A protein has these predicted regions:
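Alpha-helical and coiled-coil interaction segments, frequently adjacent to or embedded
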Residues: 1-18, 215-280
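Hydrophobic/aromatic-rich core segments of domains that either
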Residues: 139-230
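N-terminal short leaders/motifs
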Residues: 1-12, 123-135
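Secondary-structure boundary elements
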Residues: 70-129, 148, 254, 258-266, ...
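Secretory-pathway-linked proteins and extracytosolic
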Residues: 47-78, 243-260, 264
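Intrinsically disordered, low-complexity N-terminal segments that are enriched in acidic
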Residues: 1-59
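Structured N-terminal alpha/beta-domain signature
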Residues: 2-5, 13-21, 65-67, 86-93, ...
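Active-site nucleophilic cysteine motif
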Residues: 103, 130-145
Length: 280
């Protein structure tokens, strides 16, 4: 018997989870995240063969139903080092004269887009410009926003570079959401860097395509009736629950089986889509 932990995607301003289909019969238990109340499923079964899980999404209503700004205070979100020196802003980042966009732009200037950088697994200031992937960039950005006293949330999920049936997403993607004075903004600094933008712009999908969020927060801790599971850095793809209690990430491939209907602004995905994830 093998156990896998699979998240229940949240409802956000841009998406509403309509339905979720799992292979039947497949016994499961529902577990909840300790800080945010997010829900996940512990499935038990024979996973030696690939299994398909389908997620059906509709457009978001603009009203956020989940506590996306729940404060995850842990090693993945606390900044080590001097914030002011790192951002190199004329005034402290917490000053009223700075918008969230100033902090986002200051962090973006510290990065070039590249592969994963193991030196940036935990948020810390550094000198010069470093190469990193979306996780590295958003780890620093989230920690800087928190250190500046701003409301910020980290989302992990999937990005499909083309909005058509058959489009695949073999890896995960992540982005940041801020909210100040009632203004909510989505930030994908990694894609802005890839696009060669001189300054990050607010909004989803600056490179086009569509995305789906599968969790929010860093260092998620799910609890069963008998135990607390180890903290999960970010949760987009399913995890194996091994006998030693560890939660390694599963190998998956996601397929967009129906295109999302989008309006004139392709940064905001809408309507209904179906995602099928194959676990290896």
């Amino acid at each position: 018997m093998i156990i896998t932990l699979r998240t229940d995607p949240p409802d956000t301003a841009h998406q509403t989870l309509v339905g979720f289909c799992a292979p039947c019969p497949l016994p499961y238990r529902i577990v909840r995240e300790s800080q945010s109340g997010q829900r996940a499923y512990l499935f038990e079964g024979d996973f030696r063969a690939s299994l398909e899980f389908s997620f059906h999404f509709a457009a978001g209503t603009g009203t956020v139903k989940t506590d996306e700004f729940a404060d995850f205070d842990n090693a993945y979100t606390r900044l080590a080092g001097d914030l002011s020196e790192f951002l190199a802003l004329e005034r402290p980042a917490c000053a009223a004269g700075h918008g969230d966009d100033d902090i986002v732009a200051a962090v973006a200037r510290r990065f070039s887009y590249g592969g994963p950088n193991p030196d940036l697994a935990r948020p810390a200031t550094f000198c010069g410009v470093r190469s990193g992937n979306c996780i590295d960039i958003n780890t620093a950005l989230l920690a800087c926003l928190r250190a500046a006293g701003r409301r910020a949330a980290y989302f992990a999920g999937l990005h499909f570079d083309q909005n058509r049936a058959g489009s695949r997403a073999d890896g995960m993607h992540c982005w940041i959401v801020t909210e100040t004075a009632g203004r909510r903004c989505d930030w994908d600094v990694a894609h802005c860097l890839i696009a060669g933008l001189a300054r990050p712009v607010a909004g989803l999908n600056p490179l086009g395509g569509v995305r789906a969020a599968f969790s929010h927060g860093r260092g998620l801790v799910f609890e069963t009736a008998k135990a607390r599971l180890p903290a999960i850095s970010h949760f987009a793809r399913p995890r194996w629950l091994l006998a030693d209690g560890s939660l390694p990430e599963a190998a998956t491939s996601a397929v967009l089986t129906r295109p999302m209907q989008t309006g004139a602004d392709s940064r905001h995905p809408a309507q209904t889509a179906t995602l099928v994830t194959r676990s290896a």
